[in-house]
């Protein structure tokens, strides 16, 4: 009996320490993101002013037709602080004011939301294990994507540069190219609608989605503090909900279809492969289980 008591007491102490640490962390995190006097005064002075934010209207999960994750961020910001916001439709590739910007280089300033990557898509179901499998193939893309892959990969493919997304999509439809090189999030709607096959991921070719701050330093500080809280509490739910809704729309799924998808308990079997799975004690890991974890979040939105 004494032995059991000796075991229980340390466990209780550990639990209390963890709980105390969590409370301290959350309290410190919350306090560090509370508005200071200057920020509160700025809000009071600008109650009748309108803050313009530049947002795209064609960026799938993040911003389409006034909906999406970045729209929800600014809607919640407006509701939290009573700031009137005007959403101005803008090109996400060239935006330099307060709003959403997408760039090939990781921003030194700004508030990072999401990191996208390039993929190769095809009309045919083909297995590509490594870049050398692309030798002799025709790969189409826009200037930025082709510049990346032609310099970063030692492959003897034919690269075809297109001036627009429309022309690139038509080239794939006409079989003028074997593969189209595209950023995954930007093209996920077309991939779903056309039933294109993602044949290869290029995770090192990235695009960064971030909130570009404006010229008003106090407003920037308000946005930054709200972002810290919102990203921690709301971002993941917003992202997966919007992604799920996009899949439902583009795949024309019915209510019955979605009920079948979300009501199941999925049992996944696997064989150990160090490249894709890992097993330590009773815990699983690796690339495969990372995908499965994301899928679980996706269907349980």
Regions found by a protein language model. Name each.
Residues 1-88, 106-109, 113-115, 127-132, ...:
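N-terminal hydrophobic or amphipathic helices and topogenic motifs
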Residues 53, 99-101, 141, 180-182, ...:
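Structural recognition of the beta-strand scaffold that forms the well-ordered cores
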Residues 58, 102-104, 144, 184-185, ...:
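Flexible loop residues that form catalytic
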Residues 70, 84-95, 159-170, 301:
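Short helix-initiation/N-cap motifs at beta->coil->alpha
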Residues 92-107, 170-205:
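A ligand-binding cleft/hinge motif common to bilobed small-molecule-binding domains
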Residues 119-121, 209-211:
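Short glycine- and hydrophobic/aromatic-rich loop-to-beta-strand nucleating segment
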Residues 122-139:
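Flexible hinge/capping segments at coil-to-helix
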Residues 139-154:
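Secondary-structure junction motif
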């Amino acid at each position: 009996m004494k032995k059991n008591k000796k075991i229980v007491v340390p466990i209780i102490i550990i639990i209390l320490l963890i709980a105390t640490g969590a409370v301290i962390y959350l309290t410190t995190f919350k306090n560090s993101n509370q508005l200071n006097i200057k920020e509160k005064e700025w809000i009071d002075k600008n109650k009748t002013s309108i803050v313009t934010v530049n947002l795209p209207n064609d960026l799938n999960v993040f911003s389409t037709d006034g909906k999406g994750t970045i729209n929800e961020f600014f809607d919640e910001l407006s509701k939290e602080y009573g700031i009137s916001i005007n959403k101005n439709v803008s090109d996400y590739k060239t935006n330099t004011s307060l709003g959403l910007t997408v760039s090939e280089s990781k921003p030194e300033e700004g508030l990072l939301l999401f990191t996208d990557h390039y993929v190769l898509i095809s009309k045919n179901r083909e297995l590509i294990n490594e870049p050398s499998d692309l030798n002799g193939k025709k790969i189409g893309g826009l200037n930025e994507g082709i510049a990346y892959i032609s310099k970063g990969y030692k492959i003897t493919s034919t690269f075809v540069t297109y001036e627009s997304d429309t022309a690139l999509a038509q080239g794939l439809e006409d079989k003028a190219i074997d593969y189209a090189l595209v950023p995954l999030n930007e093209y996920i709607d077309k991939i779903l609608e056309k039933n294109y096959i993602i044949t290869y991921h290029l995770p090192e070719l990235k695009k960064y989605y971030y909130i570009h701050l404006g010229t008003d330093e106090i407003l920037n500080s308000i946005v930054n503090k709200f972002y810290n809280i919102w990203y921690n509490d709301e971002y993941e739910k917003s992202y997966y909900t919007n992604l799920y809704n996009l899949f439902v729309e583009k795949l024309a799924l019915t209510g019955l279809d979605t009920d079948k998808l979300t009501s199941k308990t999925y049992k996944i079997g696997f064989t150990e492969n160090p490249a894709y799975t890992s097993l330590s004690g009773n815990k699983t890991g690796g690339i495969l289980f990372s995908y499965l974890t994301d899928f679980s979040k996706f269907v349980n939105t």
